[in-house]
Design a protein with these regions (language model features):
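Residues at or immediately preceding the N-termini of alpha-helices
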Residues: 34-37, 83, 111, 282, ...
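ATP-grasp fold ATP-binding core
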Residues: 57-61, 147-148, 302
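N-terminal flexible segment immediately upstream of the FAD-binding catalytic core
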Residues: 1-55, 62-101, 116-120, 126, ...
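Short beta-strand segments
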Residues: 60, 79, 106, 159-161, ...
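C-terminal substrate-recognition/cap domain of FAD-linked oxidoreductases
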Residues: 4-11, 249-251, 257-405
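Conserved hydrophobic/aromatic beta-strand scaffold that supports enzyme active sites
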Residues: 28, 77, 183, 276-278, ...
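FAD-binding subdomain of flavoenzyme oxidoreductases
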Residues: 87-89, 95, 107, 111-112, ...
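Short, ordered loop/turn segments at secondary-structure junctions
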Residues: 61-64, 199, 304-307
Length: 405
């Protein structure tokens, strides 16, 4: 049985996240199963009934967000980091002779763990049923697969990624996490549970008609506003004919506690290269990007680093031991465009690389001022360089708060 504990000083770290904001709460719990979540919510509801109160519940994952979504304002903190198990796998035919694979996990599974488990084909299968074991064997024997959503922070949890509809650099090609979520199990505030599978419940006449596993019926009016066609994190997702799964993805834990998540896995590209292109003028970088969007067909990511970002990295490299291994950027570089290439052959990757070089020359930049990462080790170094920017900003905020809280 999960215990609701007083949030004493020993739990102080759970009052903040990477936004550096700090909140307050009275109690905390660490459920391990869906039943634990239901039990905690039921106990809180019982206490509220006795006291005539209404306790807010802040649902947490890895607390890696920069928008204070995991910072409690009062009430109870429900931390899902101990709900980190694999629950099963599923396989089906894609209609073209290939196998589609899905993996079902608890929300506390960490991105870096899931990434390495997929790459090493090391998903633990203890407790899987027969259908899941058949899918697991197909995963073991088949070609490499991956999950495309790739936020920079590798200690993020899957539940947190789903709750905020995380995107990351690869959203340029694959979109945010929402379309890759195929099923959810959600515990509602009253303890009832929803088992949602993509394609089963869709908006009709402005309403989503949901049936809980306990037999309850919920009619959810879908907002009438029009969602922008670009990345958007404001408000609940709404669209004509939308799937019920999509309502909960990006809802930041405000509609219920996401306890199980099924993700679709994609075939991994044969070749993945990272290319960091440096420019002496911002206009060169803008012109390059506009042209590259048309001519680079295998790009999975494009990221822009301005002069201030490069300056922060240069400062941190010389003043912080944690960043001492950061490479020195080319002299005179004022901005950078990072391009990730995903190709089915090295020949195609080289073709795209020469296209990048040609585009740089056309905008007046020097194509020799690039970093090309072709190995896992080089790509990890490139990832460290990219992640160092937000991490450095957070460190600077911490330093300045010492003198200006």
């Amino acid at each position: 049985m999960t215990k609701i504990q007083q949030l004493t000083l020993e739990f102080g770290e759970y009052l903040k996240d990477e936004s550096r904001s700090c909140g307050h709460a009275d109690t905390i719990s660490f459920p391990r199963t869906t039943d634990d979540v239901r039990q905690v919510l039921a106990e809180l509801a019982s206490l509220d009934e006795e006291r005539g109160t209404c306790t807010p519940v802040c649902v947490q994952g890895g607390r890696t967000g920069l928008a204070a979504g995991a910072v409690p304002a009062s009430g109870h903190v429900m931390n899902l980091s101990k709900m980190n198990a694999y629950l099963g796998m599923r396989a089906c035919d894609d209609g073209r002779g290939a196998t589609r694979l899905f993996v079902r996990v608890q929300p506390g599974l960490v991105l870096s763990q899931r990434r390495s488990d997929l790459a090493d084909k090391n998903i633990p299968c203890a407790g899987f049923d027969d259908a899941s074991m058949a899918a697991w064997r197909a995963f073991q024997e088949g070609p490499e697969v991956f999950f495309p959503t790739d936020p920079t922070e590798v200690s993020a949890t899957i539940g947190g990624m789903v709750a905020c509809n995380a995107s990351g650099a690869r959203s340029y090609r694959y979109g945010a996490v929402r379309p890759h979520v195929s099923a959810l199990r959600v515990v509602l505030a009253d303890g009832q549970t929803l088992a949602l599978t993509r394609g089963q419940v869709k908006e009709h006449d402005g309403v989503l008609s949901l049936t809980t596993e306990q037999g309850g019926c919920i009619e959810v009016p879908v907002p009438a506003y029009t969602m922008p066609s670009v990345k958007n994190a404001s408000g609940y997702y709404a669209a004509p004919g939308m799937d019920a799964v999509d309502l909960f993805v990006g809802s930041d834990g405000t509609l219920g506690v996401i306890c199980e998540i099924e993700l679709e896995l994609l075939a991994a590209p044969a070749v993945t290269w990272g290319v960091s292109c440096f420019f002496e003028q911002e206009q060169q970088a803008m012109d390059f990007t506009c042209a590259a969007r048309e001519r680079i067909t295998c790009a999975s990511a494009m990221e822009f680093f301005d002069e201030a970002a490069l300056a922060i990295l240069a400062h941190q490299r010389t003043t912080s031991r944690a960043f001492a291994t950061l490479p020195v950027t080319p002299e005179g570089a004022r901005c950078c465009i990072f391009v990730e290439l995903v190709c089915q052959s090295e020949d195609k990757a080289y073709e795209e690389l020469w296209e990048i070089a040609d585009l740089m020359e056309q905008v007046g930049a020097d194509e020799s001022r690039t970093w090309v990462a072709r190995t896992d080790l080089d790509r990890e170094a490139q990832r460290f360089f990219r992640h160092a920017v937000p991490e450095s900003v957070n460190m600077l905020i911490d330093e300045r708060r010492k003198t200006d809280p």
